[in-house]
Amino acid sequence: MRKDGPACRRRSLCGPTFLLIVSVCAGTSAEGLPPLPAQVMSASPLPPLPAELSPVIPLPPLPGSAAPQPTTSFDVGTTIPQPWLFGNGDEPLDGIRPRVLRRPIGPRTAPEPVPTPITFPTRWRTPVDPPIGYTGKSSVMPVETQQDPHFVPVEDRWRTGYSAWDRYDKGHPRNDDYPFLPGRRFDPFNQNVIKGDFPIIGQHTFLDVTASYLSFQEFRQVPTATTPFESTARPNEQNFFQRPNQFFSTNFFSIAFDLTHGDAAFKPADWRLRLVPTFNFNNLSVQELGVVSPNVLQGTSRTRNFWALQEAFFETKITDTSSDYDFTSIRVGTQPFISDFRGFLFADINRAVRIFGTRNANRDQYNLAYFRQWEKDTNSQLNTFNDRRQNLFFFNYYRQDFLVPGYTAQVSVTYNNDPRSFKFDNNRFLVRPDPVGIARPHEIDVAYLGWAGDGHIGRYNLTHQFYWALGRDSLNPLANQTQTINAQMFAIEGSYDRDWARFRASFFWSSGDRNASNTHATGFDSILDAPNFAGGGFSYWNRQQIPLFGVNLVQRLSLVPNLRSSKFQGQSNFVNPGLILPNLGADFDLTPKVKMFNNINFLWFESTNALETFLFQGRIARHIGTDLSTGFEYRPLLSENVAITMGASTLIPGQGFRDIYNNQNSRVGALFGGFLAINLLF
């Protein structure tokens, strides 16, 4: 069959047409396009185009010369006629290109620029929960940026957030226990930046601000001498010892600022600054003249106030001595210090330089301190800025788990240099020297060698203390001559815990002077004690200051009957009767909020020779009496923020006490004391 229709002709022309276009492209001399190889260019010229192609591909007229341009072959050197279709290479080919290959008609206009949107680096954030407690503002500036969603830099590691936790799935009712809750600025019960729980500068500097108020109200009965030959509070009074009733009130307001640099746990502080300004307001009301002041015109009541910078010291670490956080630090300024476990010898806040530290992974501790005592205010016992010129040196060393686990042993050496001085207190009573015998200024140099222990052996608790005092008194007022001091003291307490009860038995002994007329002073006396022993402040004998002819038979918050004018402003007196005190006690945790303390003390003088010499009395019995006391401590919030302490005590006089305080026609009766102390902390 013959296939010569129009379609067939079109198909038969496709090959030459394609060859023609390829030839035109290959033979052009446009810049950058190399000519075809000579084998191709030397081929036979193309045959004439059929007539039917003219309307399909119209050819533009050739500009310039119509003669074809010869083309030289690269390898043969023969010339062939250049097809007229190629022209001279300068003419546009849009006329022969298909429509899809032609250039746009007219000049192309540049599109208007599209503004580039402002972009910020993408940050991946995780949900941020508030930190627990009141953290305040952070002073840590961020220095890192987040680079990927797997790591969120948190420069302030103290203020990490915690999610709210409904521990018991109760739907968060009021007044329930929920951890990880945000706090408030003045919330003392949860974590707070002003309590030192979060740093205020950087990540290692903390500020702890503690405001405290202590209100102490006391009713007491003590033997009170009057002045029957000068003036009395009531007419027709003839007895020497009159109405014993007294009421004492004292109130302390203080704010403690404690700035510490270091870590919050384990590692000791690098440095520390502490300031505690304190204000006191006190009042004493009695029923006899000559008590609040030797001037009877001052009446029977006295009100005083006083403020002091009670604590002010700077502490810094000298060195780290081991990888177990052992250290050596130094503290300079007015600071608290207790010489032993129970405060038998010295417990005070005063001006000092103290070096202290630990050894053997905190198993050993040591103190080396020098105190230069400030003078005390008479009625508040706060520090003044007057130099007393008394020098004290302390060295003690503690060893934990000594012999048995849970038992700590201590050895100590203490030196007291109290030079000559003459002092009237703020109430115009003579306190140095003691107004007994030959009241002349004298100097005391005495050293105390101590051995103590505190802890438990199995289920039995044990505390003991021994002191040996050796030294010299240049002129004892009572003995009226130089004294060589050689006196001792011993105390021991054992207790047993049974569930919520503790049963105690203790014994205290201080040597007495058996001959006040010789040159050997053998009655033990402390420096400035505050013993927590045999009932402590709940006991009548311990708490009350029992006056006796210008001095005191026993000092306030002391056990030793030292015939001293004042524990806080007087000098030690080693010519005294001494004391024997056995004790039985029982403490009960009635509830988690209420504790009960019960004690019974039996009191004897170790020797009465010093009393007989002082009172010009023939014979005084040794039995002082029986001291009964009970007390309660109530903490309604189960913390120290609110603590209420109350106690009641009585002294049933023995024959020795009656020999001293009986009137000519009457006997001294039982003496009572009761107190209420409210301590508020924030």
Task: Specify the residue positions occupied by each region the protein language model found.
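C-terminal structural cap/anchor segments
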Residues: R514-H623
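Outer-membrane beta-barrel "beta-signal"
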Residues: T630, V668-F682
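N-terminal periplasmic/intermembrane-space "pro-region" immediately following the signal or transit peptide
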Residues: G27-D270, V276, D499, F503, ...
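Surface-exposed loop and membrane-interface regions of Gram-negative outer-membrane beta-barrel proteins
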Residues: S231-N251, H261-F327, I338, V436, ...
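Structural signature of outer-membrane beta-barrel channels/translocons
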Residues: G202, L214, D258-A264, E315-T319, ...
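Bacterial N-terminal signal peptides
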Residues: G15-C25
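Signature for the C-terminal beta-barrel architecture of outer-membrane proteins
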Residues: D324-D326, Q335-A521, I580-P582, D589-P592, ...
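Membrane-embedded beta-strand positions of outer-membrane beta-barrel proteins
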Residues: V209-Y213, L273-P277, I330-V332, Y366-L368, ...
